[in-house]
From Swiss-Prot:
Function of the molecule: Catalyzes the condensation of carbamoyl phosphate and aspartate to form carbamoyl aspartate and inorganic phosphate, the committed step in the de novo pyrimidine nucleotide biosynthesis pathway.
Protein name: Aspartate carbamoyltransferase catalytic subunit
EC number from the UniProt entry: 2.1.3.2
Signal peptide: none
Protein's organism: Pseudomonas entomophila (strain L48)
Gene this chain is encoded by: pyrB
Length: 334
């Protein structure tokens, strides 16, 4: 674990409700299940002619993305809008941070504008945790991805995808394949799978892209794709994160595809009803071939749909927990 793994008291209020969503580390199975159940209920909202519920009416959600991600930002915006919140998305490249204003000052100014919640994405591990603990403790903070550390909403939308296609986690074999070393998605998925009772979690990749000590997550390590995929129920493919790599970690993208790219032939080693997932963006012909990404085993587009519902669940639950804590503090101050 990194030193930034979220402490339970910071993420939960005194009643055990979610108030920030920073990491899946330390969160109990019951809370993860509540998030999944709540997200399931929000899937129905997305099927309506009018895709809105009034749970966050009058609240302001600020998306503060210091690292680009069109898919994540858009699904958070849709989630907040479907909850009837007012949404501000800060374009950091044109904001005052590019003029020398610090992260601290930027967020304090947004808080002064009566923001109720921040969705933060940052290239530094621990950024969301720092903001929740030291910058804006009275504003609900949702981690939209921080460095290599965590991407908890992606982890939960992956769990919702698995649960809706496979039911219980307790008899599943799940393989996570690719650049494990640089992937915050891999870390969040491993934590969630372990907490939800998955007995067989496998990570597959070249030795140079598997972190030392990863066994502490309760996973089995494979450096041979065929061996690692044997009889699995779920395959989660990850892209090569070149932007986070130092030189020499792998020979070439072509070499990676030759050894670890998911093809129809290689997928045949998994169970016949295995599902294939990918957090995106997909690099076709690098970690996965088009015939698999677009084939009958792929649930990649389902992940996008479920992501909106999961983010609706997290936003609504964190806002409720933050409000409950504020009321609790006021009552105890009297």
């Amino acid at each position: 674990m990194t030193p930034f793994d979220a402490k339970r008291p910071l993420q939960l209020n005194d009643q055990g409700q979610l108030r920030h969503f920073l990491s899946l580390d330390g969160l109990p199975r019951e809370l993860l299940t509540e998030i999944l159940d709540t997200a399931d209920s929000f899937l129905e909202v997305g099927a309506r002619a009018v895709k809105k519920v009034p749970l966050l009416r009058g609240k302001t959600v600020c998306n503060v993305f210091f690292e680009n991600s069109t898919r994540t930002r858009t699904t958070f915006e849709l989630a907040a809008q479907r909850l009837s919140a007012d949404v501000i998305s800060l374009n950091v490249s044109t904001s005052s941070t590019s003029k020398g204003e610090t992260l601290f000052d930027t967020l304090r100014n947004l808080e002064a504008m009566a923001a109720d919640m921040f969705v933060v994405r940052h290239s530094d591990s621990g950024a969301a945790h720092f903001i929740a603990e030291h910058v804006c403790p009275d504003v609900a903070v949702i981690n939209g991805g921080d460095g290599r550390h965590a991407h908890p909403t992606q982890g939960m939308l992956d769990m919702l995808t698995i649960r809706r296609h496979k039911g219980s986690f307790e008899n599943l074999s799940v393989a996570i394949v690719g650049d494990i070393l640089h992937s915050r998605v891999a870390r969040s998925d491993m934590l969630a799978l372990k907490a939800l009772g998955c007995p067989d979690i496998r990570v597959i990749g070249p030795k140079t892209l598997i972190p030392i000590g990863i066994e502490q997550y309760g996973v089995k390590v494979y450096t041979d794709l065929a061996e690692g995929l044997k009889d699995v129920d779920v395959v989660i493919m990850l892209r090569l994160q070149r932007e986070r790599m130092a030189g020499g970690l792998l020979p070439s993208e072509g070499e990676f595809y030759r050894l670890f790219g998911l093809t129809t032939a290689r997928l045949a080693g998994a169970k016949p009803d295995a599902i294939v997932m990918h957090p995106g963006p997909i690099n076709r012909g690098v970690e996965i071939e088009s015939a698999v990404a677009d084939g009958k085993h792929s649930v990649i587009l389902n992940q996008v749909t479920y992501g909106i519902a999961v983010r609706m669940a997290v936003l609504s639950m964190a806002m409720s927990g933050q409000n409950a804590q504020r009321q609790f503090d006021q009552e105890n101050a009297q």
